[in-house]
Amino acid sequence: MTTDAVQTMIPTLDVTERPAPRPKVEAGVKLRGAEKVARIPVKIIPTTELPKKPDWIRVRIPVSPEVDRIKSLLRKHKLHSVCEEASCPNLGECFSGGTATFMIMGDICTRRCPFCDVGHGRPKPLDVNEPESLAIAIADLKLKYVVITSVDRDDLRDGGAQHFADCIREIRKLSPNVQLETLVPDYRGRMDIALEITAAEPPDVFNHNLETVPRLYKAARPGSDYQWSLTLLQRFKQMMPHIPTKSGLMLGLGETDDEVIEVMKRMREHDIDMLTLGQYLQPSRSHLPVQRFVHPDTFAWFAEEGYKMGFKNVASGPLVRSSYHADEQAKLVKAELLGS
């Protein structure tokens, strides 16, 4: 297999450990871009400009009455969508189709992953009214499939697991037929209590992204652990064998195709049912640089290999994100699991 990829930037990571200044950050203050990544242990040298995207990765500007309507509804209920916070390239398509991925527990993350466009800082206390507000918004939108994700909340005793459970419970009160997928954080140091809470109010699909290959964790996911994330997914599957588990990777951070295949094998060893693979897009000059744009043919090859390994569904393409067409993927996988 010859990888057909467009190589773009020379790596600009300085992996030398360096002391980072630690000015006190006030609660509720969101750090983004250079301010955010200045606090990680690996120095990132800003690129002079963002790389030019190939033709296959360009998307239309998300402008339509439906996009405006959903944004207005989110503001009305003081909710956040990861579609906006993470600058998702599929925002226009998903919003225009009347769907959205909701981000709970605020819009300030306690982690500072330099690939991500969500702000970092000291979060405010949880909004106790958010589960009810989210349930009302979903009922107003008449959604049939909802993805709930969150910022990392390392400040919470359970990592936010109870808040996820509260949201699921309130949503099902008002929309009993809705299908719910949760895209959860890694619950670092809190796995036991988080899984106990999750099992009491489980979603219809349990998703947690590995994001990248283990060699790049120090640069891309400071504060996270590759094996911990795999174990989280496997332990949930052992507790709830009929609920699909799902994970995903971004490509273009400097990984090799062989490394991607190895991670896919490890996912299957940990009983992960569904896989998403998409192209990493650099949110700003201060974020991790794009090392390559992976050709659609290579994404198609990864999908073929994934099905050979036993994944029940593989979504692999330049614009694929973890919640992209999640309803269609989950329907097929759940039917197979329930029939097995």
Swiss-Prot record:
So which cofactors does this thing need?
Answer: [4Fe-4S] cluster
Substrates-to-products reaction catalysed: [[Fe-S] cluster scaffold protein carrying a second [4Fe-4S](2+) cluster] + N(6)-octanoyl-L-lysyl-[protein] + 2 oxidized [2Fe-2S]-[ferredoxin] + 2 S-adenosyl-L-methionine + 4 H(+) = [[Fe-S] cluster scaffold protein] + N(6)-[(R)-dihydrolipoyl]-L-lysyl-[protein] + 4 Fe(3+) + 2 hydrogen sulfide + 2 5'-deoxyadenosine + 2 L-methionine + 2 reduced [2Fe-2S]-[ferredoxin]
How is the cofactor bound, as the UniProt entry phrases it? Binds 2 [4Fe-4S] clusters per subunit. One cluster is coordinated with 3 cysteines and an exchangeable S-adenosyl-L-methionine.
- Mind telling me which NCBIfam families this protein's record contains? lipA, PRK05481.1, PRK12928.1
Q: Which PROSITE patterns match?
A: RADICAL_SAM
Designated gene of the protein: lipA
A single Gene Ontology CC annotation of this entry is: cytoplasm
**Sorted alphabetically, which HAMAP family does this protein's record hold?**
Lipoyl_synth
What family does the database annotate?
A: Belongs to the radical SAM superfamily. Lipoyl synthase family.
State the species of origin: Pseudomonas fluorescens (strain Pf0-1)
Name the record gives this protein: Lipoyl synthase
